């Protein structure tokens, strides 16, 4: 036998692939594809972290996209108007059911304009209820975020917000079991 694929001819490589498939090996499944796939997936996982979505896997996202747009797969979702239907439907669902506030004001601090911050704030409300004292609630939220991200609230990155959303999402799903 040969020790490297480089030493094999194309016929020999295909024989190896066939032998592996015969033993049950399958190629790794590709993730969602297309120009709007990442945004849709991020929103879908956010909805899952808010407790709205029961199935976070790609087939569930694809079923949602098909219901909203009539398009079978995100790889065929090329028209921004079609993508907007699915994106806005997800955002609307999060606003209605989880009270995610997507509005922006000119006096809003930069950190609060980040989608992850908006979702984390909604998660915080789900877990803690409406604030009795807005200032105290904000300080508790700020402390929670900064202790987990090791970063000041005003310097939080999108990636750091993902970690916060995942932590809060675990807590929300634990409550709903």
Label for each model-derived stretch:
Residues 1-177:
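Interfaces that engage single-stranded nucleic acids at replication/repair/recombination sites
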């Amino acid at each position: 036998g040969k020790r490297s694929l480089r030493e094999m001819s194309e016929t020999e490589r295909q024989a190896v692939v066939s032998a592996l498939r015969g033993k049950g090996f399958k190629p790794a499944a590709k993730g969602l594809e297309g120009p709007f796939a990442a945004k849709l997936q991020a929103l879908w996982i956010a909805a899952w972290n808010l407790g709205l979505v029961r199935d976070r896997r790609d087939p569930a996202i694809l079923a949602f996209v098909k219901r909203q747009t009539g398009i079978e797969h995100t790889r065929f979702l090329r028209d921004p108007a079609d993508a907007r239907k699915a994106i806005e439907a997800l955002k609307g669902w999060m606003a209605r059911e989880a009270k995610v506030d997507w509005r922006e004001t000119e006096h809003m601090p930069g950190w609060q304009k980040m989608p992850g911050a908006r979702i984390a704030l909604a998660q915080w409300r789900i877990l803690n209820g409406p604030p009795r004292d807005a200032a105290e609630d904000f300080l508790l939220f700020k402390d929670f975020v900064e202790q987990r991200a090791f970063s000041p609230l005003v310097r939080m990155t999108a990636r750091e917000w993902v970690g916060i959303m995942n932590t809060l999402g675990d807590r929300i799903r634990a409550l709903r079991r």
